[in-house]
Amino acid sequence: MSEQIAVKTILSGTELGPLADNERLKRESKNLRGTIVEDLQDRITGGFTNDNFQLIRFHGMYQQDDRDIRAERAKQKLEPLHNVMLRARMPGGIITPKQWLAIDKFAEENTSYGSLRLTTRQTFQFHGVLKPNIKLMHQTLNSIGIDSIATAGDVNRNVLCTTNPVESELHQEAYEWAKKISEHLLPKTRAYAEIWLDGEKLETTDEEPILGSNYLPRKFKTTVVIPPQNDVDVHANDLNFIAIANNGKLVGFNVLVGGGLAMTHGDTATYPRRADDFGFVPLEKTLEVAAAVVTTQRDWGNRSNRKNAKTKYTLDRVGVDVFKAEVEKRAGIQFEASRPYELTERGDRIGWVDGIDGKHHLALFIENGRLLDYPGKPLKTGVAEIAKIHQGDFRMTANQNLIVAGVPAEQKDQIEQIAREHGLIDDGHSEQRKNSMACVAFPTCPLAMAEAERFLPEFVTEIEGVLKKHNLPEDDNIIFRVTGCPNGCGRAMLAEIGLIGKAPGRYNFHLGGNRSGTRVPKMYKENITDRQILSEIDELVGRWATERQENEGFGDFTIRAGIVDEVKVSKRDFYA
């Protein structure tokens, strides 16, 4: 069978089976409208019904409930306490002080938890918004120039961009491209404006030239990266543009395609995967290449089995070279050889950083991205107080931290004082804590199998104790991440130690990632308790402290010492 016929057979669906029900849902949704308006008017239930439960994701929301009280409500013959989580669309994570004060006020007055959550998608989330407040939420955001279009669902989601503040023209150029890519790949339907902003209902076909009438087979994630920083974790994303500069000016991008971390417990046809390097493209071809990758995945992705619908599986099914050739054909280009670059670090530089324009930037470590007023540490109030006087902007990072960017010299002391008074600067935070993160998980995430955000702080304290026990200096820390389920939001599958929730109090224990985020870790122990994990870490760190080579990271040591095998090709090696 020729390559062309083989590809056509794959695309026709004859090898992939009947379409998943989500494809019917999207096709019948009237371009993402469904019957969401009718559901909003239904006060009998606090949730969304039938297809609308899925459709609201395309509008940036997930239906959730408080799982801590789910059983008690069931005893009382009550439905779960339904609410929504909203994820804002903020390409590059930049938000103004005026916008910040507005979202702070909304979170305080109209959410069940009174918090703001910075996320690994370089944006913020509201948690615990009840149905009567949903429309107000969207209208509040719209009034300050923010929306949540396409931050969830089978579309291109919030575009990430390296967040270190404007230290060069290159950073600003990269951010501008992140915005352009985001706008270019957005859904064109007017459903969002009609439903949430009371927009005029126009007679229109709502054609989707890039996403198509059935949108994408699965979610799609895009980044813009400035080497050597890999804060956005390129290998967690479907499409990555690696900025290539000449004399400090952006000249184009190396394009990496097919990364992704989600998998399904017990299903060896699912796995985390590094992205493949397609080559270099000049700036003027950036949007054409972005659209070509998206439309190729749109047409070739698996619409039968959603567990195998991501771009990474399409590449492994049809072949990287075949996929790349189709992208070249659609974009009208030939990829050039990749330009040299190196990714060496992922962490945010916490503290003050000087910009080239005489301004200063303060990166604040926000553990797990949760901004809340804790006893003795009113973090959320602290950021709001800074916003009241700040003349620059804020930058949310993909590590769930916050940068106060563009601070003039005369305001440095005042802003630092506010930050310290509210616990936003804590000199007691170790490097280990700064290099650890978790997804939300319980009590709000419906997919969580184990704790993550609530589990991480105390467990990191215990890891700190292990490092101290083995006389390791502060700089010798471990990239440690926890996710409550195998869907990958906490990016644990690019950590030196990654814990994946399996059941309450139990995790799959992965080892062997590296500090730069360019290697997938391998499972070391399955379904073990946190106490067992800590015991294993104690033993392994002891070996690392005594057996390592000079400047050898923990993940590199576990590979060299034969504790786990290196994952080079995920499809072949991850479960081997």
From Swiss-Prot:
InterPro entries: CysI, NiRdtase/SiRdtase_haem-b_fer, Nit/Sulf_reduc_fer-like_dom_sf, NO2/SO3_Rdtase_4Fe4S_dom, NO2/SO3_Rdtase_4Fe4S_prot, NO2/SO3_Rdtase_4Fe4S_sf, NO2/SO3_Rdtase_FeS/sirohaem_BS. Siroheme binds at residue 489. One of its GO terms (cellular component) is sulfite reductase complex (NADPH). [4Fe-4S] cluster binds at residues 439, 445, 485, 489. Its cofactor is siroheme; [4Fe-4S] cluster. GO terms for biological process: cysteine biosynthetic process; hydrogen sulfide biosynthetic process; sulfate assimilation. It catalyses: hydrogen sulfide + 3 NADP(+) + 3 H2O = sulfite + 3 NADPH + 4 H(+). It comes from the Bacteria. Binds 1 siroheme per subunit. It is an enzyme of class 1 (oxidoreductase). Keywords: 4Fe-4S, Amino-acid biosynthesis, Cysteine biosynthesis, Heme, Iron, Iron-sulfur, Metal-binding, NADP, Oxidoreductase. Pathway: Sulfur metabolism; hydrogen sulfide biosynthesis; hydrogen sulfide from sulfite (NADPH route): step 1/1. Its EC number is 1.8.1.2. Coiled coil: none annotated. Pfam families: NIR_SIR, NIR_SIR_ferr. The keyword rRNA-binding does not apply. One of its GO terms (molecular function) is NADP binding. Alpha(8)-beta(8). The alpha component is a flavoprotein, the beta component is a hemoprotein. NCBIfam families: CysI, PRK13504.1. Component of the sulfite reductase complex that catalyzes the 6-electron reduction of sulfite to sulfide. This is one of several activities required for the biosynthesis of L-cysteine from sulfate. Belongs to the nitrite and sulfite reductase 4Fe-4S domain family. This is Sulfite reductase [NADPH] hemoprotein beta-component. The gene is cysI.
